[in-house]
Design a protein with these regions (language model features):
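Conserved, well-ordered alpha-helix/loop/beta-strand core segments that scaffold catalytic motifs
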Residues: 42-85
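Short beta-alpha junctions and helix-cap segments that line functional grooves
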Residues: 72-73, 174, 298, 403, ...
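Ligand-recognition elements built from short beta-strands and adjacent flexible loops
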Residues: 280-282, 343, 380, 385, ...
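Small/polar-residue-rich segments within soluble enzyme cores
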Residues: 1-54, 418, 435
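Solvent-exposed, polar/charged alpha-helical surfaces in well-ordered, non-transmembrane soluble domains
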Residues: 2-3, 13, 17, 21, ...
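Flexible, solvent-exposed loop/hinge segments and secondary-structure transition points
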Residues: 65, 72-94, 101-105, 110, ...
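Acidic/histidine-enriched alpha-helical segments
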Residues: 19, 82-94, 205-209, 273-275, ...
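Beta-lactam-recognizing serine transpeptidase/beta-lactamase-like catalytic domain environment
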Residues: 35-48, 93-182, 187-420
Length: 597
């Protein structure tokens, strides 16, 4: 997003390119008049133009939220072994971009850098006359301009190197297209509800497949979902149901909303090289949208969009139906810090009514509480979202996993879109992307000061805060803790508590362990952090207790029986203080599939 400059300090990509003239300013100059003999005339014919200093940019990006997003994407990139992991966080009410990250990225201070692995890859591909890294026209040009095998290999390496660097420098969020998959079903639902061709109570019986012209389109649940209403159709991510919604709309109305939500145009974000969708290439035109094309488009297949288009559309549902212009520059300042210009939120158009938006938001919340998006659940924050898993066009066996959401569902502040390109093993957005979004949502809303509102069921499962025991007698402290259900370990022979772990007010489980130290110079007890990954909640709790550690659960504890741990806040094998709280992240692999082969 920031981009970089060349050796001449001229912007080459990102904001450095977009705002190069503004950031650089204008050099001063003197214009003199000459007489017929090329001699200088009097000063009265001289014009002096003072230099104008460049302005500085203040971005909408929040460095804390940016770090949350980047850290989470780096983890899922490593775990999924995908080709890339991408994410964006937007203020749903203004269009301001709060965070944007592309993993694998590049070093802004050394944009030409390649890893040893990348260099080896370039060298190997350069020897091939059918390298997948080269287009047919590039290979043809190399063959025409180089006579020897060595020359052609060198030319290939140069082109492949440049291709690889250009790919690194591209901002996937604004410049690349992807297959949105089932996340797009929220658009189909919005259109169907707005046009009154369906209601939340409209029912459909899914048998596991549907016949469209000469094709059989399958649901990811081969045995079918049975009879379900529209809300459960979205929760279950049922393809046949949404095919029928698209067919009820008809091609003309479907295209009208496809266009209204911004999928046929640029969003207008203030970054360079935003991709312009090409009719007939990236999406079906109205003239070419037959029953098959309409049906596949209705559940998010057979067309491509940019991530910035998708999160802008998601934000429109979150904010009551207004399609905003996304932006990253909040204001420009002169050399003295004075505001030269300031970006104002821009509503491009109203795409659906507030009533429809609220209905869809409620349906999306059910996706997270009980549907394919359950791994995006965050206790105390109502999250509304939709999972997506799509097969790449013309690339059988390769997938894009994604999840789009906003929170809090009842009073939205932020929208989050997470995309993993070509994951290995688990391919579903409900498995891969939802936990990432949950972490970003939880940490971001906490940082923003958004207060949690717990349900009665959540209240029963809440962690507690360690009481202040310093200064109490050991006897009184132990009596209080045992009465409250805590386990107690005492270190030292003193009769008063000098310090404790966890410290006062730190988060810990209601039945956790507290260590009481009674001597100032007593050695602190330590514990080795186990590897909690791959365990059930019960197994994690037992292992933590036997290891002398407290556990904070992150995940939908209301569905504890189907949860498996996948990450932890302190690395396995690390030495930490006895009684410290370790956050263990859980997700479900049950009922989160949303893709049919």
């Amino acid at each position: 997003m920031i981009g970089f400059t060349g050796d001449d300090d001229v912007g080459r990509s990102g904001l450095e390119l977009k705002y190069n003239d503004t950031l650089t300013g204008t050099p001063g100059r003197i214009v003199k008049a000459l007489n017929g003999k090329s001699g200088a005339m009097d000063d009265q014919y001289e014009s002096v133009y003072d230099a104008v200093r460049g302005t500085s940019l203040v971005l909408t990006v929040n460095e804390v939220i940016q770090r949350y997003l980047t850290d989470s994407l780096e983890q899922v990139y490593a775990d999924s072994k995908g080709k890339g992991a991408y994410g964006v966080v937007m203020n749903v009410n203004t269009g301001a971009i709060l965070a944007m990250a592309c993993i694998e990225d590049y070093d802004l201070n050394d944009p030409q850098h390649l890893t040893d692995e990348e260099k080896d890859y370039i060298a190997a591909e350069g020897e091939k006359d059918d390298s997948s890294e080269l287009t047919a026209s590039q290979e043809k040009e190399i063959e025409a301009n180089n006579s020897t095998v060595e020359e052609r290999a060198a030319a290939r390496r140069k082109v492949i190197r440049n291709n690889l660097l250009f790919k690194k420098w591209r901002n996937f969020i604004t410049s690349d297209i992807y297959d949105p998959g089932s996340v797009f079903k929220i658009i189909t639902a919005s259109a169907g509800l707005e046009e009154n061709v369906v209601t939340p109570e409209t029912s459909y019986t899914c048998t596991g497949k549907i016949q469209v012209a000469d094709r059989t389109i399958k649901c990811h649940k081969r045995t079918g979902h049975g009879t379900q209403d529209l809300t459960h159709g979205l929760m279950n991510s049922c393809n046949p149901f949404f095919i029928t919604v698209g067919q009820k709309l008809g091609a003309e109305k479907f295209y009208e909303y496809f266009e209204a939500f911004g999928f046929t145009e640029k969003t207008g974000i203030d970054l360079p090289a935003e991709t312009m969708p090409v009719a007939g290439v990236n999406y079906h035109t109205l003239d070419t949208m037959g029953i098959v094309e309409l049906s596949s488009s209705s559940f998010g297949q057979s067309f491509q969009v940019t991530p910035i288009q998708m999160i802008t559309a998601i934000s429109a549902i979150a904010n009551g139906g207004k399609l905003m212009t996304p932006y990253v520059v909040a204001k420009q300042l002169d050399e003295n810090g004075n505001v030269v210009s300031e970006t104002q939120p821009n509503v491009r158009r109203q795409v659906i009514s507030k009533q429809t938006a609220n209905i869809v938001a409620g349906m999306m919340e059910q996706v997270v509480t009980s549907g394919t998006g359950k791994n995006a659940y965050v206790a105390g924050y109502r999250v509304a979202g939709k999972t997506g898993t799509s097969q790449k066009l013309n690339n059988v066996g390769h997938y894009v996993a994604s999840f789009g959401c906003f929170a809090p569902a009842d009073d939205p502040e932020i929208a989050v879109l997470i995309i993993v390109d070509d994951p290995v093993g688990q391919i579903n957005g409900g498995q891969i992307c939802t936990p990432v979004a949950a972490q970003v949502v939880e940490k971001s809303l906490e940082y923003m000061g958004v207060e949690r509102e717990y349900t009665d069921s959540e209240m029963k499962l809440l962690d507690t805060n360690a009481p202040n025991l310093v200064g109490s007698t050991v006897e009184d402290a132990k009596a209080l803790l045992e009465q409250e259900g805590f386990s107690v370990k005492t270190v030292g022979k003193g009769d008063k508590v000098i310090s404790q772990m966890p410290s006062y007010n730190q988060t810990m489980p209601q039945d956790g362990i507290i260590v009481l130290y009674t001597e100032q110079d007593a050695d602190r007890l330590t514990a080795t952090v186990p590897d909690f990954r791959g365990m059930t909640m019960s197994q994690v709790n037992k292992l933590a207790h036997s290891s002398g550690l407290n556990i904070r659960i992150s995940g939908n504890a209301l569905n504890a029986g189907e949860l498996v741990s996948y990450d932890q806040s302190i690395e396995a094998g690390a030495e930490t203080e006895y009684g410290r709280t370790v956050t263990v992240y859980f997700k479900s692999n049950t009922g989160v599939n949303d893709y049919a082969d």
